[in-house]
C-alpha cells in the first residue's frame, strides 16, 4: 500500500487508500471496505469508502444503484459509537443510496450491496468469515465421509474452498484511492489467481474506474 501511494500518489479528496472488494459467500457478493488498511477512520473517510464502493459495485459488478450500509451493532440510527453516529449523519446527507445501519448478518442476505466499516472491524470480519467457512466445509466433509469415497470428499472440499477464497476467485482486492489501478493479491497466490487479478485490473481499466472514483468523491 505504501509503495503504491508513493509511486502513483493519491486521488484528490482521498485521505488514505483502502483495500476492499466482494465478500464471497454472501448472497450477492457484497462489496465491503475497509478490510484492514486503516484501523482507525474518521467519519469523512467512511463516507469516501461509501462512494468508492458504490462505483465498484455499479461498474465492475453491474449493480443498479447500489445500496450502501454502515456496519454497526444494530440497525437503529442511534446505535453505535461516536465514529459511526457521526458517519451516519454524513451518509444521510450524501448522494449515495444509503439504507442506514446494517448488522453483520445482513452481509449474507440481499439487503445491501456495499458495506462500510473501518479496517479494524473489516479485517476481523474477513478472517472470521474465512475461518467459519472452512469450519463448515470440514464439518460437512466429516458428515459425508461415511457415505462417499475419500477422493470424492476431497474433491468436493477443494471445489467449495476455492470458490470461497476471494483471493483465488477474484485475484485479490483492489487498492482504492491511489491514482491508478492496483490489485492486492495473496502471498500464496497461484497462477490462476494471478490471472484473475490481471483480468480484474483490465476490467477496472476498461471502465475507467479511477476517473469514476474521482467524480464520485467530488460529488458525494
Where are the regions that the model predicts?
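Gly/Ser/Thr-rich loops at beta-strand to alpha-helix junctions
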Residues: 1, 74-78, 189-190
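Glycine-rich phosphate/nucleotide-binding loop
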Residues: 4-33, 111-115, 119-220
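Structural alpha-helical scaffold elements that stabilize or flank donor/cofactor-binding regions
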Residues: 107-108
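Glycine-rich phosphate/diphosphate-binding loop of Rossmann-like nucleotide-binding domains
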Residues: 39-104, 113
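A generic short-segment signal for beta-strand/edge and adjacent turn/coil regions
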Residues: 1-4, 36-41, 67-69, 83-85, ...
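Short, glycine-rich nucleotide/cofactor-binding loops
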Residues: 37-47, 184-191
Amino acid at each position: 500500500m505504501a509503495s503504491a501511494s508513493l509511486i502513483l500518489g493519491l486521488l484528490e479528496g482521498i485521505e488514505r487508500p483502502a483495500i476492499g472488494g466482494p465478500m464471497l459467500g454472501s448472497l450477492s457478493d457484497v462489496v465491503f471496505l475497509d478490510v484492514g488498511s486503516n484501523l482507525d477512520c474518521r467519519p469523512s473517510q467512511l463516507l469516501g469508502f461509501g462512494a468508492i464502493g458504490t462505483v465498484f459495485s455499479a461498474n465492475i459488478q453491474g449493480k443498479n444503484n447500489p445500496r450502501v450500509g454502515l456496519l454497526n451493532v444494530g440497525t437503529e440510527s442511534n446505535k453505535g459509537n461516536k465514529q459511526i453516529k457521526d458517519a451516519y449523519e454524513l451518509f444521510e446527507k450524501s448522494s449515495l443510496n444509503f439504507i442506514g445501519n446494517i448488522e453483520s448478518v445482513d452481509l449474507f442476505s440481499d439487503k445491501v450491496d456495499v458495506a462500510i466499516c473501518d479496517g479494524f472491524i473489516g479485517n476481523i470480519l474477513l478472517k472470521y468469515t474465512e475461518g467459519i467457512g472452512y469450519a463448515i466445509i470440514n464439518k460437512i466433509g466429516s458428515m459425508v465421509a461415511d457415505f462417499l469415497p475419500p477422493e470424492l470428499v476431497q474433491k468436493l472440499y477443494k471445489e467449495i474452498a476455492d470458490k470461497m477464497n476471494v483471493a483465488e476467485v477474484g485475484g485479490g482486492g483492489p487498492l482504492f484511492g491511489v491514482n491508478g489501478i492496483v490489485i492486492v493479491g495473496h502471498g500464496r497466490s497461484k497462477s490462476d489467481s494471478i490471472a484473475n487479478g490481471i483480468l480484474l485490473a483490465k476490467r477496472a481499466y476498461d471502465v475507467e474506474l479511477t476517473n469514476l472514483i474521482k467524480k464520485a468523491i467530488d460529488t458525494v
